[in-house]
Amino acid sequence: MATKFPKFSQALAQDPATRRIWYGIATAHDLEAHDGMTEENLYQKIFASHFGHLAVIFLWTAGNLFHVAWQGNFEQWVAKPLKVRPIAHSIWDPHFGESALKAFSKGNTYPVNIAFSGVYQWWYTIGFRTNQELYLGSVGLLLLSCALLFAGWLHLQPKFRPSLSWFKNNESRLNHHLSGLMGVSSLAWTGHLVHVALPASRGVHVGWDNFLTTPPHPAGLTPFFTGNWTVYAQNPDSPSHVYGTSEGAGTRILTFLGGFHPQTQSLWLSDIAHHQLAIAFVFIIAGHMYRTNFGIGHNMKEILDAHRPPGGRLGAGHVGLFETITNSLHIQLGLALACLGVATSLTAQHMYALTPYAYLSKDFTTEAALYTHHQYIAGFLMVGAFAHGAIFFVRDYDPELNKNNVLARMLEHKEAIISHLSWASLFLGFHVLGLYIHNDTVVAFGQPEKQILFEPLFAEYIQAASGKAVYNFNVLLSSSTNPATIAGNQVWLPGWLEAINNSKTDLFLKIGPGDFLVHHAIALGLHVTTLILVKGALDARGSKLMPDKKDFGYSFPCDGPGRGGTCDISAWDAFYLAMFWMLNTIGWVTFYWHWKHMTIWGGNPGQFDESSNYIMGWLRDYLWLNSSPLINGYNPFGMNNLSVWAWMFLFGHLIWATGFMFLISWRGYWQELIETLVWAHERTPLANLIRWRDKPVALSIVQARLVGLVHFAVGYILTYAAFVIASTSGKFA
């Protein structure tokens, strides 16, 4: 007899109802809950899956390289990066009629999809110039992908499975990850930038055929070994340097110029190389700090145990944290996701403000798409961090081990933490909404001069301190007599000051009352999301209603007062509610970024400054005005090359709206629905020939909410993606 799905749970496999399938899918990745799972086996399975994850990433990147080389126009784009629109891939679609074939055809090619991912600018900056190089890169990544898949398989074989003690050897792991993963990889990337990318930016091709015979600097390695390192920073590219050619090119490879290359409006490659080298140096040193084989260096347990507050009135400090974190994968994952979430959000900010890739800042749609993309990813990562923090408290937290330490004390005064967050959220919410509504009311009644408009003085002061001259604050870097200004004048400051005060760059945009209001609206969203997540995690193990619910698990729903009021203590429900707040908060962030930039790019920043002070301005002058290209993508009179985005805009709305059917429901409703469907199925000719072995039962409350949430999130993001791309490329094609 064939084993029923899921093999990892005997109890589920024997369930006679359809919940066997849904619970099987839901718990497929909950490895620690599988039958016969030991701690060692759990670590080994997760370790092996990392190789699979990396293989998928490299396979995906290989696909990008391959399709651009095969169907793109990379070489034409390299010749004229500001005139040619980059092609992602061809479109072969039987639905295309004559007008669509024309609309989606560029330069006598077959219909194509335009690339808004920034890969052209990235590959160009790091030294790619021909399709053949793209093909080679693709094949290389494909081979690497295969090697990683093999490595994943190999590490599941009995002889090659690492032991549990190997996984829990924190010092060795830290040393290897810091030195190897971060340090050596940064050093390798510095090498690539210096040996391949920089010469390419100066018109010198370096490939597999000549990389050993083409030194990146005319002085070779002599200055390195003689300690005369300043030679590498002499003779810079001139301001008139034509990127990708030797015209105006210098020879320096490691610099501290500050600002941007005048032609490409991207960071100087030699500055990036210098930065990457510094990171490599710091991390390689850091990777030699922890005590392993030689009995020297730091010991993590000693460091944590030594962190006890003086005076003894603040408890046991970090005692117990070493064992707690070492033995809990959930808290490790939570910390990693939180760090990665912050890094991803910072990437979104720096990708446009300090553009690293040549000509990226001239491709407005790509810039907008990359910002939106990275902010949404950051949101999901951050919510995931808190979700795993809550699971840690349910599954892994040991009150005895953590007695009176920082974790225990945080739990003991959680009411204070939650109430303070609540007060901050209430203050922000009432004041921000009150200001917006006041402004809407006076504008509606014909007295716009009575709006309450705050000048963001503190933010302007910070911008001025960083060198922004427009506010006339004369402080720190915007003061010519300040010691900081004098100190930096010989090195990076002239380039930086030129960049920060140049109206063509995105570095510290001029701000006003509209920015002040939306900043506080975003702060409201962040604080409420944090409140929900923090409360969900701190109450995950128990609350006033249920002092300890360790055996209750993590993913039970808030189900109203009928079952004893589980809304107070459901960590899963907190995660679920926080997802909506996270999505809406990032909506405010991306709306703000996109609208402000649309007005700057269009040469009319005054539109944002005037209309962003009241809600109707946002609805009318941002959403409605910019959705016109989408609404007119196709109509009774024909279509244009935005029609696919227009259709996706509609499709996204439909997915989003479908979510509400699952969100506004309860378990009895689902049971009735499924039984009605079964009844109809069994009485319909032909359909009743098909039977299923499992008895159909309703979705659980958690499952229905998850289905609703997925529709809400996917529909929401698809809708906004289509809006950003079509509205920006429609205006700035």
From Swiss-Prot:
Membrane topology listed for this record: Multi-pass membrane protein
Query: Top EC class per UniProt?
Result: oxidoreductase
- Residue positions binding [4Fe-4S] cluster: 558, 567
**EC identifiers of the protein:** 1.97.1.12
Keywords (A to Z) from UniProt: 4Fe-4S, Chlorophyll, Chloroplast, Chromophore, Electron transport, Iron, Iron-sulfur, Magnesium, Membrane, Metal-binding, Oxidoreductase, Photosynthesis, Photosystem I, Plastid, Thylakoid, Transmembrane, Transmembrane helix, Transport
Which reaction is this enzyme known to catalyze?
A: reduced [plastocyanin] + hnu + oxidized [2Fe-2S]-[ferredoxin] = oxidized [plastocyanin] + reduced [2Fe-2S]-[ferredoxin]
Residues recorded as binding phylloquinone, renumbered to this chain, are: 670
Q: Where does chlorophyll a B3 bind?
A: 661, 669
Free-text cofactor note: P700 is a chlorophyll a/chlorophyll a' dimer, A0 is one or more chlorophyll a, A1 is one or both phylloquinones and FX is a shared 4Fe-4S iron-sulfur center.
Q: Where in or outside the cell is it found?
A: Plastid, Chloroplast thylakoid membrane
Q: What is a GO molecular function of this protein?
A: oxidoreductase activity
Biological processes, Gene Ontology terms: photosynthesis
Q: Which amino acid positions bind chlorophyll a B1, per UniProt? A: 653
Q: Which GO terms describe its cellular component?
A: chloroplast thylakoid membrane; photosystem I
Primary localization class, coarse: plastid
Q: Which residues cross the membrane?
A: 46-69, 134-157, 174-198, 272-290, 329-352, 368-394, 416-438, 516-534, 574-595, 642-664, 706-726
Q: Please name the Pfam families in this protein's record.
A: PsaA_PsaB
Q: How does it assemble?
A: The PsaA/B heterodimer binds the P700 chlorophyll special pair and subsequent electron acceptors. PSI consists of a core antenna complex that captures photons, and an electron transfer chain that converts photonic excitation into a charge separation. The eukaryotic PSI reaction center is composed of at least 11 subunits.
Q: Which family does it belong to?
A: Belongs to the PsaA/PsaB family.
The job of this chain, per UniProt, is described as: PsaA and PsaB bind P700, the primary electron donor of photosystem I (PSI), as well as the electron acceptors A0, A1 and FX. PSI is a plastocyanin/cytochrome c6-ferredoxin oxidoreductase, converting photonic excitation into a charge separation, which transfers an electron from the donor P700 chlorophyll pair to the spectroscopically characterized acceptors A0, A1, FX, FA and FB in turn. Oxidized P700 is reduced on the lumenal side of the thylakoid membrane by plastocyanin or cytochrome c6.
Record protein name field: Photosystem I P700 chlorophyll a apoprotein A2
